Amino acid sequence: MRNAGVQVDTNMQKISLQDTVLVNEMKGRVKFIGETQFAKGIWYGIELDKPLGKNDGSANGIRYFDIDLKKANSNGGYYGLFCKKDTLQFYKPDDDEHSLLNGNAAQETIKNLQVKCESLASKLNKIKIENHELKTSVEKLSTNETVLLSKISRLDKLVKELKVENGNMKTHLDNFNHLLDASDSVMAPDLDKGTLLERSHLLQGLLDQTKLSYDKAMKVQEDLLEENTQLLEENAVLSKKISDLGLQLQQTNNTIGDLALQIEAQSKSSNIVDKLTNDNILLTSNIKALNNELEELQAKEKLDENLRITYEQLEQELRLQLSNLQSALENEKEIAGTYIEENSRLKATLESIEAKTSHKFQSLELKVNTLQEELYQNKLLKKFYQIYEPFAQPHLAALSSQLQYLAEVIESENFGKLENIEIHIILKVLSSISYALHIYTIKNTPDHLETTLQCFKVNIAPISMWLSEFLQRKFSSKQETAFSICQFLEDNKFLDKDVTLILKILHPILETTVPKLLAFLRTNSNFNDNDTLCLIGSLYERSLSLIARIDKLIGKEEISKQDNRLFLYPSCDITLSSILTILFSDALFLRQDYKRISSLKKLEVFFQGIESLLENITIFPEQPSQQTSDSESQCNIKEGNFSNSLLSDRLNEENIRLKEVLVQKENMLTELETKIKIIIGRDLERKTLEENIKTLKVELNNKNEENCGKTEILNKLKEENFNLVNRLKNMELKLYQIKDNNTLNKIYLDREKVDRVNLVSEIMELRETIRRQIKEQKRVSIDFSWLDELPAVENKQPFKEHINHSLDTLGIEMFNFVSTSRILDLKLDQPLAEDELWHERDHSYISYLKRKRKNIRLKSQNVVTYYK
């Protein structure tokens, strides 16, 4: 690792100007980086150490960089070469070469540098002083010249104006005299003596005025001429001063040259040598410190070697762990793949089973619904036909109980609909009428009772129609039935005016139908006003009071136990048909929402009619007759015989058929229960499979988390590896920068040479401009009073003492500059970037020049004051 060779790959480090590189095992320095006209892309111009190149820094007549002339003239041949970045390699010198830079060579280079710096500083200060003096003299010359020219031009203008005015006045006087002569000659014989005297007086006054103005103009002209003469004299004096000042300037230049020679002679004195020896001691101490740092760096290199070995061992172990983890991960992935395949297969089977079970479940639901419908119908028929069992033949009491049963069935179902309320109340009314007819058949009154019964059974209450509608659960409109009931009651006055029948019909209407009708109107209508709500509440309360009154009238104590009967007063014309027409027409069968309020008002009228009816009811005692008792006994005997003869066979057959149907239904229900149990078992199996799948997913997630943790550990180890590599590279870079600081010193010297050439060229241009202005010999006055006060250099001894004092101060400044300069102290323990070096170097150099300029001004002022 300590031989000359490549330090780092060029792709990892940026190549810049003045870097030492290798091109095909040839050492050289980078002098150009950029695009060229002979080929595309970025090319690197290299100045080789040996004449093994292909050109002298130019190609196709275009120069891209310069080669050292001494090298080219002494050895001959070409030192230039153009190449790409890929062929370049950084050059790292051997430790043997580095060890040759011992203390003696460093001291010699330091002495040479200090001598060059002092000479450059003295020359530069001298040139700066000359430059400043010449600039000030040029500025003063230019200002005085402009002032004088402006004054002369102003005076010339005044003289010209006065001459013009004088000529105008003369011409004006001549013209005036001619006019006077002409007027005198023309008007002399005509005018009187008085007028002539007046005119003469006027002309005399005008003449006096013109003389006064002429005298004033002449005085002004004389003053201007005097001023002009004075200015000309001043101009002559100034021109003499300029010539004298030119001679003084030459003398000052000579004195400045003598001073520069004396400063150069004194710069080689012992003080500067002592300071240089001190600087040499400092440099040796710095070199020792650098050697100590090199030893520390070598120890660090050994540590880095040990770290690298441990890192390689760790890397091998981690790679083994990685391979093991990858194999385990692949196995787990295979297991997860099998689990996923099994999961997908189970999902497919589950979906097929669910589809089948859903289809079977739907079919079973249909069967269950049909069976429930059939069971409902069978129960309805069973209960319906059980009503006939106590009777031997069809009986009105049985019909009443059948209608009552159907009313209870419709009440147990959805009673919120208006149609159900309608059917319920009609069935209640028909049941009450059939029971009343049954009572009348027992009493065998009136005469035409048979036709009335036949009409009621066939037209009013056809039980077969009601039974078929209940079995199919499809009910037709019953408005015609309601009106036919009212018509039937009107035709049969004994029923229409039967108070007991009226009360028995009104009781269920007021107890169940009216509250549900009010609730229906309240919920299914948009009644938001308080008046309507109060009306519904009052109607409900009135229905409750009416029910209480009806209960009192038809109570067991008043009717059944005592031989009393209810009658209406003859003046009362209220009948059952009139009450039912009010109820059926407007209150119950009104289906328009906007007419609900009118239906409530009709209900109020209905309640008023019931109240008036109840007020007209009276109770009278009734004498029992022998005929009625005989007829009742005969009817009972007939009924018993008839029921025993007809119903026995028919009921037996019906019971047998119903039992068979029930057995079939029970078998079907058992089959359905077994199928449902099978479906439940399959559902449990499906749930267990889903739970297994969930557990497998949880295990997979845990494995994935473990893999993520292992990958994070691997990433951390990779980062540590990367950081160690970067540290090693940084250490190598530091070593390279410590060994490459000599090249930076050379760059600094080149930059100083360039600055010196620029300053010299600027000063030469200023000298040429001053000489050109002196040759033109313009008449300008320059104030060089400060040069008149310069002392003559006759007393050599005090002047030399002061020069020695100034040289001491200059030596102190040089020591400070050398101690702060980057040439002596490059801070080798802290590697700097090249841009930073250029910036700090320029900054320190500029600050040094400013300090020197200021000190030279102070010295010149001190010299002048000393000799005053």
UniProtKB/Swiss-Prot annotation:
> Could you tell me which InterPro entries the record lists for this protein?
CAP-Gly_dom_sf, CAP-Gly_domain
What biological process terms from GO does the record include?
actin filament-based movement; establishment of mitotic spindle orientation; nuclear migration involved in conjugation with cellular fusion
Gene3D superfamilies for the chain: CAP Gly-rich-like domain
Q: Which GO terms describe its molecular function?
A: microtubule binding
Query: What is its biological role?
Result: Motor-binding component of the dynactin complex which assists cytoplasmic dynein by increasing its processivity and by regulation of its cargo binding. The dynactin complex is required for the spindle translocation late in anaphase and is involved in a cell wall synthesis checkpoint.
What is annotated about its quaternary structure and interactions?
Component of the dynactin complex composed of at least ARP1, JNM1, NIP100 and ARP10. Dynactin comprises a short rod of the ARP1 filament attached to ARP10 at its pointed-end and probably associated with the capping protein at its barbed-end. The rod is implicated in dynein cargo binding. A sidearm formed by NIP100 projects from the ARP1 filament and is implicated in motor binding.
Provide the protein name: Protein NIP100
Per the UniProt record, the source organism is Saccharomyces cerevisiae (strain ATCC 204508 / S288c)
Quote the gene name from the UniProt entry: NIP100
